[in-house]
């Protein structure tokens, strides 16, 4: 159990949260992770003035469809700046369906459109599949900015954890291909070290996999 690794002085703050372990059984982990996230977001009231719409794009390979969710606050007049957002989950977990409250709050608070990407997950879809999904999405976003009421000159990328790692890779891909420019990148606790060989990765030995 993860909670047994927490300092007793801090444990009380975690009591209201759902207990969650990362097991070697990935299908079970995904089911429990999604259930945990769904329970967490059920506490939030939706923001009616930040509606969203799903779009389906063709990926660069294997005739795969990429689901993209665009949030656009109704109180923004004129073309809005946009943040392409990539969810976390260790590259193996996560979905845009469990991030609705966070995306609505971010779009409302910042005053921008949010474009959330349902990129493919490992191990079923190894690198570079998720990165290709992200590049296909931002290319679509730039090309369709006018119809989406988005300012193509103010498009940023960002993500959290594994999503931030993808955002960093996407920024490099955009730079190298030179097809368009980005305003900035927002990396929250980015997962960047592909070696994953810090002491904390292996100690204490709990049987928990990452």
Q: Which stretches of residues belong to each language-model region?
A:
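Gly/Ala-rich beta-loop-alpha elbow adjacent to hydrolase catalytic centers
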Residues: 159, 163, 167
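Short beta-strand immediately N-terminal to the catalytic nucleophile in serine-hydrolase-like folds
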Residues: 156-159, 188
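Short beta-strand element of the alpha/beta-hydrolase
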Residues: 68, 79-89
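Short amphipathic alpha-helix adjacent to the substrate-entry channel of hydrolases
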Residues: 96-117
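Hydrolase active-site cap/lid region
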Residues: 172-210
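A glycine/proline-hinged amphipathic helix-loop "lid/cap" segment
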Residues: 1-70
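Gly/Ser-rich "nucleophile elbow"/oxyanion-hole loop immediately N-terminal to the catalytic nucleophile
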Residues: 142-157, 177
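Alpha/beta-hydrolase active-site loop
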Residues: 125-147
């Amino acid at each position: 159990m993860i909670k047994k690794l927490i300092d007793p002085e801090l444990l009380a703050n975690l009591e209201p949260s759902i207990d969650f372990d990362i097991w070697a059984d990935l299908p079970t982990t995904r089911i429990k992770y999604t259930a945990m996230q769904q329970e967490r977001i059920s506490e939030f009231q939706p923001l009616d003035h930040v509606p969203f719409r799903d779009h389906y794009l063709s990926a660069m390979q294997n005739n795969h469809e990429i689901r993209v969710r665009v949030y656009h606050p109704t109180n923004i007049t004129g073309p809005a700046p946009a943040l392409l957002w990539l969810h976390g989950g260790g590259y193996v977990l996560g979905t845009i369906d469990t991030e609705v409250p966070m995306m609505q709050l971010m779009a409302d608070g910042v005053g921008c459109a949010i474009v959330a990407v349902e990129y493919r997950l490992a191990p079923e879809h190894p690198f570079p599949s998720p990165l290709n999904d992200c590049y296909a999405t931002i290319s679509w976003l730039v090309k369709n900015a006018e119809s989406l009421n988005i300012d193509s000159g103010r498009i940023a990328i960002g993500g959290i954890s594994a999503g931030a790692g993808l955002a960093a890779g996407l920024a490099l891909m955009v730079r190298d291909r030179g097809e368009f420019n980005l305003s900035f990148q927002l990396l929250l606790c980015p997962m960047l070290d592909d070696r994953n060989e810090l002491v904390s990765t292996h100690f204490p030995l709990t049987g928990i996999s990452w």
